[in-house]
Amino acid sequence: MPRPDWAPLPRPGCVNVDGKVLLVREGLALAMLRFEPEATIDEHSAPYEVDVICLEGEGFISVEDRVNSFAAGQWMTWPADRVHRLWTADHGMITMMVERL
């Protein structure tokens, strides 16, 4: 079975973030993101809910004006059509993204 490879996120505003898509099915996509220290995904929104699970490391997560620390074992749901962001400071982080398309 082929294994997906890590690749830089092609989205403008993403700095030092690699991703790999694990699964895409009707209504569902699973991906992992790997953040280096000082990495960021700029503020953006999506027309669907996204569950974000921190698997390893630590960083920060926001929804609109709410900013929270984000560390291994924590999760948050980004509501549809709300501005959100993920980033790191001194440490790296790996997240699982569960997109309900």
Give the residues covered by each predicted segment.
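A short, N-terminal "cap"/entry segment at the start of jelly-roll beta-barrel domains
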Residues: M1-A31
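Short strand-coil-strand connectors
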Residues: E26, S62-R66, A89
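Short, conserved beta-strand element in jelly-roll/cupin
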Residues: R34-E36, A46-I61
